[in-house]
Structures are given as C-alpha cells and as structure tokens.
Amino acid sequence: MNSQSLDLGGRADDRASALPCAARTGADAPPLSAHGVTLGDFMDDMPVGALHRFVVWVIGIGLFFDMYEIFLVSTIGSALQNEYGLSRQSTDFKLLLASAFIGMFVGAMCLGSLADRIGRRNAFLLTLVWYSAFSLIGAFSVNADMLVACRFLTGIGVFAARYRYYPVADSFLSEILPKDKRGRLAAWAYTTSYVAVPLVGFLALWLNPLHVGGVAGWRIVLALGSLGAVYVLLVQHRLPESPRWLLAQGRTADAHAALRRFADGAGVRMPEQFAPPAEPQRPHGLRERIALLRRRPYRARYLMLVIFHLLQGFGYYGFGTLAGTVVKSRGFDVTDSTLFIALSFVGYPIGSLLSIPLLNRIERRTLVIASILSVAAFGLCFAYSGNTVLIVCFGVLTTCASNVFSNAYHVYQAEIFPARVRSTAIGSTYALSRIVSGALPFVLLPVLVDYGAGAMFGTISVALGIVAVTLRVLGPLTTRRSQDEINPV
C-alpha cells in the first residue's frame, strides 16, 4: 500500500533468532511466494488475519470517540443557549460551535506531520488521551468562555488524533490492509465510529432536560467523551506499529518484527528474503517531504486535496453543526429540535454500512463524486421540507449520503500518496477543512438568519459542486490497484 521506494530489501529474518521457530513460521502456515517479492507486495497480498481485524476494531473505537466530540456541541447547543443565555446570532454561541474546529486547525498546523515523525501508533494513543482529558475538564466549565477554551484545546487533540486522528487512522489502515480488502475493512472501522453520532444525539435528548445529582445533563454528555482515555490504557500494549512506516524510517528489524505479527495472525510464513529496495530507507525531513509533494503526480493530487478540503466541510460539517439550529429557527422547542436531529443522525451509521459493499465494487473516485452530489441534493430538500416527517426523512438521507462520501474519501485520500508523506499530505490539507468548518457558523448563520434555510443550503450545494468537478479533473483512479501502481515514485 505504499510506493515502491518504501519496500525494504534485506533478509526478513533479521530478528528471527530471537523468536521460536513455530512463532516465526507457523507449523501449518502456508508460505507465500517469495520470488522477487517486496515487503509491500507481501502486505498487499497477505490474507486478512487476526491482527488486521484487531487494528480495524481499535481504530474504529478510537474514531468513535473522535466523532462523539465533533458532533457533541451540535446536539447540546440548544441546552448551552439556555444555560448561558446565548442567542444564535451572538458571537459567544458562534464560538461555541466553532471552537473545536479552530482547535483542529491549530492542531493540524502544529502537529499535522506528527504521525510521520513518531509513528501511527504513538500519534493515535497520545492524541486520544489529550482530547479525552480536555473533554472532561470542559464538563466542569463555569462559564461560556471556559467551555470555548476547553473545546478549542479538545479540538487540537482531536485533529492530532485523526491527525487529527482520521489522517492517522487513514494512513494506518491504508498501510496495513491487503489491497483487495482495503476499502471494505476500512469502511467497517468508520462504521463503528459513526455509531457515536446518533448515540450522542439520543444521549443529549435524554440528558439535556435533566439534572443528575445537581449536575446539568449536558455536562454528563461532555464528560462521557473522556472515556477514550480509558480505552487507550486497555489497548495500547497490543497495538502494533505500521511496518510500512517503520520501513520509511530505515528501521529494518523493527519493520520485519511488526510484519511477522501480521503474518502469524494471518497464518502465513514470511519469505526468507525480500526483493531489494529501490532506494535506501531512512527518515525524511520536512523539506524532503515537501519536495516530493511538488513532484508529479503528487503535485496535482495535493492541489486537488487543497481544494477538496477547503470546500467539503460545507456539506459534511455544515449539516452536522447547524442542522439543529435550522430546525429550531422554524419554531420548534429544544426537545423537538434535538429529537429531529437525533433521528436524522441515524443516517450516519446506515450510510457507513451501505458504503461497505460499494467501496470495492465502484471506483472510489466515482463514489466520492456521486455521494457528495447526493449530499447537496438531499440537503436542499431538507431545507425546503415543510413538515416534520419530511424534515426527518431528508435529514436521514443527507446524513446517509454524507457517510458514504466520508468513508469513500477517507480511503481514497490515503491511497494517493506514498507512506513517507501520507500523513503530511493529508494532515496539512485536512487542516484547511477544520479552519473552514470553524468559520462556518460565522458564514452560514448570517445567511440563515437573513435569507433562510434554502439560501444557506444553496451556498453549501455550490461548494460541493466545485468539489465534484475538481475530483473528476484531478483525481486518479485507485480501486483494486496496489500502492505501487497508484504511487509510482
């Protein structure tokens, strides 16, 4: 899943003497053909094993807490308005909606290449603990300013965790999963995460009106997000590092040891020797990574991702962040608007499930384009819906299409760069979507107040149309192709 220059030569048994023979080879494990095989070829053709499935599960649960944090404020926003006496036109309310996204942008700028420097595993674990801690502190906020600060700091960790944590997760999954199963298994991880979206909606519906032991219900919803740190403590010792990242750092023995864990879990033997590398393997500094991104074909791909991430947040986070405010602007009370949004959010895991069979059957670029245009169409229908049934119906269709889109593009963007620059490329461009998402309340709320929901979703649709055209013109084809084919340099 990597460029050819990252496939390591040398003997695969650098550490073999330290391991029992059965652990190295497996008594009944069938060997894979070793003639001329690179380490990348071996990983691409390996059957899915127990460790692959474990990593998919770990990534999915980690992303669960990430999605919980992102959609949190949209579900408790009405309760926060009542708690702090904020109107939807007030700067403080806009900052509450935007603060986590602004933090994500800062996190990306400061930590966007973190995973390329310290590894996929360490970046994932570190940042999950970070944003869990500030989520817990935010639950004890004494005023709106303190909550804004905590949401900002949470956002820094949330971006770093995706690299924010999604860009770590995207890289991790892209690098370890066999090419024929890459899309389907990655979609299972994302599907697990999206269960958090309706869950936080229904938790808010239940807890927002309550005081439990004198504690406001919305504070409990915030505090539950901190459980991600507990999860880290439970899994960190079993989570492997990406062999491809280790190869990119020139850590031959460590790469082979990590790969051996995947091979043992899949019941196959590692070859005695891999084909030699195209070039020496060593860590790449920031200047070298930037230089590679300026070369063909990555220059056009990087430009595509810049435009893509500047505008895609209008659809995905524009709806997720502001849908509750749109419903409330039509005269529904806090409970009713929270109920409608919680029901609409059921579409997120449904859409993610639908993407699983689609990702390997439909060219991923085509799937991204079709789904983002569907988001635009369903969002407009949501804006013009005149009764509660249609509001919920088109809300579900919008969120469903959103997650077909999200799963497809997360797999897609991780495939179109080699491993040594993957986190840097995705992290730096993804940061743009965070700052745009942070600005959305300041851009779209005035449109909603002055011109109505139709104008607001019309603005969103124009942005998504530009994304679709850019993908069609600049995006490469990737489905059922190896990383060496996709990334020739």
Can you say where each PLM-predicted feature lies in the sequence?
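Transmembrane-helix signature of 12-pass secondary carriers
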Residues: 2-489
